[in-house]
């Protein structure tokens, strides 16, 4: 297993993937891994775990670092974050602002995204 650092693009792609579910559907970790082919398995699993730690999922079922997990839905917090970063333009601005700081934690990235949206609304 290689070392993994936080990849905001992977987080965004996972959230978009989970958001695409119809009401009442769930998605398996393997399905997310198969959809997000640009990332390796360990990277996707690591970022699913980071989403869990940041309370982005209402419920998950799995064993630690297992491929056989399942995600049930996004939390309101995740929906809000995704609404702020869904637009490619706002996402680029968010990543640009974050890069000026350096490596940022997920809560900081959420705040930056919120600030970018507020700035877009004011202009």
Feature names for model-found ranges:
Residues 18-21, 51, 82-85:
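Generic structural signal for hydrophobic core residues of well-folded globular domains
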Residues 37-54, 69:
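Short amphipathic alpha-helical interaction segments
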Residues 8-12, 42-45, 72, 76-79:
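Non-catalytic, well-ordered alpha-helical scaffold segments
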Residues 66-97:
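Short, amphipathic alpha-helical interaction segments positioned at domain boundaries
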Residues 3-36:
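Short amphipathic alpha-helical interface segments
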Residues 85-123:
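Exposed, interaction-prone assembly regions rather than primary DNA-binding/catalytic cores
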Residues 52-63:
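A short, conserved structural fragment
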């Amino acid at each position: 297993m290689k070392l993994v650092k936080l990849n905001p693009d992977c987080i965004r792609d996972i959230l978009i993937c989970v958001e695409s579910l119809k009401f009442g559907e769930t998605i398996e970790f393997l399905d997310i891994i198969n959809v997000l082919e640009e990332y390796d398995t360990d990277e996707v699993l690591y970022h699913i775990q980071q989403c869990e730690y940041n309370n982005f999922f209402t419920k998950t079922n799995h064993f630690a670092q297992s491929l056989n997990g399942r995600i049930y839905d996004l939390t309101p917090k995740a929906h809000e974050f995704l609404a702020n970063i869904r637009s490619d333009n706002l996402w680029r601005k968010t990543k640009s602002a974050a890069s000026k700081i350096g490596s940022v934690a997920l809560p900081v990235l959420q705040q930056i995204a919120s600030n970018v949206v507020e700035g877009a609304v004011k202009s």
